[in-house]
A protein has these predicted regions:
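Transmembrane beta-barrel wall of Gram-negative outer-membrane proteins
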Residues: 8-33, 46-85, 110-132
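Face-selective signature of the C-terminal outer-membrane beta-barrel domain
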Residues: 63, 67-78, 108-278
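Short alpha-helical linear motifs
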Residues: 30-32, 54, 96-97, 157-161, ...
């Protein structure tokens, strides 16, 4: 039996492996956890970044007898990303027309990604001429992307006179506005698989065969929209109406971008082969 453990400011990892007394059972299990919070904090946008990554892997093999063995391979992975933005400053333009964009944020983004995988395989060799293998596996992935981000931005003209004591500072405002980014996206996919392989080799004849059956199910939903408004021009407001100041017909908020999709996909795949050689 052997084991290891590593720890750091960004996470840690560990594993254990070994066999039982008679050597029939062997195993290898490992786990990891990592956060990149310190790395993301160096980005231009000032925000509270909290990314987390965790996974667990395992491989177990057991020999029932000299002719028959069973093995299992599994993996679990969970990733989570949370961002709460605060503000951002961006300088751009030329020396003759230097600009600064300052944005103050409200809201947050929360993304989750989960993956599960498991495979069970058995190998049976009743004789030196015949070898049989059966494998069944399952795969599941789930993803979520959710965010509501409100940004209030100011566009500044910077002082471009090289001889001025205020060179590079804000000279005046060129415009203000707001924007909203919204998303509720999800993906759910499942894959089930069963396969068989075999070969028979005796004297001058060799036969190989196999087949595979697989089922796939995918559910994909996307719901995103983006609204950009300058001085609330896109928001509903009372219209001018001489003689009837209370007139206010129905008005709509016009989105800058809108995307809504939903896909449900189910498929079956079957395949097989046989080869005879001398």
């Amino acid at each position: 039996t052997a084991a290891s453990l590593q720890l750091s400011m960004l996470g840690g990892s560990g594993h254990i492996e070994g066999t039982n007394k008679n050597g029939r059972l062997s195993y290898l299990i490992g786990a990891r956890h990592k956060t990149s919070k310190y790395l993301f904090n160096a980005m231009d946008t000032k925000a509270d970044y909290t990314p987390k990554f965790s996974d667990l892997q395992a491989f177990i093999n057991y020999e029932l007898n000299t002719d028959w063995q069973i093995s299992f391979l599994g993996n679990i992975s969970k990733n989570e990303y949370t961002m709460i933005p605060e503000n951002r400053d961006t300088d751009f333009g030329t020396i003759n027309e230097a600009l600064k964009l300052r944005i103050y944020f409200e809201g947050q983004e929360v993304d989750k990604y989960e993956t599960y995988f498991g495979a069970l395989s058995t190998t049976y060799q009743p004789s030196t001429e015949l070898n049989l293998q059966f494998t069944t596996s399952a795969f599941q992935t789930f993803e979520q992307e959710n965010f509501d981000i409100l940004g209030e931005y100011w566009l500044y003209q910077l002082e471009n006179n090289l001889g001025s004591d205020e060179f590079g500072d804000v000279a005046f405002d060129r415009g203000v506005g707001k924007y909203i980014n919204h998303a509720r996206n999800s993906l759910n996919a499942r894959v089930l698989n069963f396969s068989h392989k075999g070969n028979y080799n005796k004297e001058a004849i060799k036969v190989d065969w196999g087949f595979r059956m697989q089922k796939e199910e995918i559910e994909d939903k996307i719901s995103e929209w983006n609204l950009i408004d300058s001085a609330f021009f896109n928001f509903p407001h009372p219209v001018d109406s001489i003689g009837n100041p209370t007139s206010n017909p129905n008005q709509q908020i016009v989105m800058s971008e809108l995307l809504k999709t939903q896909i449900n996909l189910s498929s079956y795949r079957n395949s097989g082969y046989m080869q005879v050689s001398k």
